[in-house]
């Protein structure tokens, strides 16, 4: 959204989504912003399996790989939205290099740390979601020779909670966005 409404800017100091509105005990609303802050809050306050490992070192490494995802998302987003071939190629190369780095860290799967879905998986799922929308041959080139990253991407795409995280018209809306940006990938 290029022209954000005033009500949104009032709620979101960073001007970004997502936002989470929470009713406090006294009836007053509190707004949380920033994806990871919201994820941490939900992990700490909602029932279910914890999304982080119990071991402090493993948990710290999970958080480090979550931090790594921010740069990956930035490179991917610039690649997806590029209207110039040189920028698209540069960002695709950077993203591919980051995937190669992750490849060596991945377990035998299906998720980042093995059989258990974790916060790392929840953070990377939106990154990998775009690859089900863009041209399949482009996805194949980016993931070529990276069997663990490819399997991880597939496992996340098949997970019901990941599918349910976006509206049924997500692909249509994203393609519309690419056309608005005159992105190379929209052609």
Describe each region flagged by the PLM:
Residues 1-110, 183-185:
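GST-like domain detector, emphasizing the conserved glutathione-binding G-site
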Residues 33, 91, 129-130, 143-144, ...:
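Catalytic cores of transferase enzymes with a strong primary signal for eukaryotic protein kinases
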Residues 49, 132-138, 163-165:
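Substrate-binding/catalytic groove segments of enzymes
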Residues 114-137, 142-151, 156:
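GST superfamily/GST-like fold recognition
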Residues 159:
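C-terminal active-site-capping segments
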Residues 166-187:
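Acidic/histidine-enriched, glycine/proline-rich intrinsically disordered or flexible terminal extensions
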């Amino acid at each position: 959204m290029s022209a954000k409404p005033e009500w949104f800017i009032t709620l979101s100091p960073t001007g970004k989504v997502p936002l989470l509105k929470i009713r406090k005990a006294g009836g007053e609303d509190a707004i949380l912003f920033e994806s990871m802050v919201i994820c941490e809050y939900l992990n700490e306050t909602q029932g279910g399996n914890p999304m982080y490992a119990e071991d402090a070192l493993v948990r710290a490494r999970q958080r480090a790989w979550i931090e790594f995802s921010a740069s990956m998302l930035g490179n991917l987003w610039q690649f997806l939205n590029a209207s110039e071939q040189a920028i698209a190629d540069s960002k695709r190369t950077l993203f591919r290099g980051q995937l190669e780095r992750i490849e060596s860290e991945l377990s035998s799967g299906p998720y980042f740390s093995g059989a258990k879905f974790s916060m790392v998986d929840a953070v990377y799922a939106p990154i990998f979601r775009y690859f089900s929308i863009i041209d399949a041959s482009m996805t194949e080139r980016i993931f070529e020779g990276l069997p663990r990253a490819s399997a991880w991407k597939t496992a996340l795409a098949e997970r019901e909670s990941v599918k349910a995280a976006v509206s049924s018209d997500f692909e249509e809306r994203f393609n519309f966005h690419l056309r608005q940006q005159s992105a190379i990938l929209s052609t």
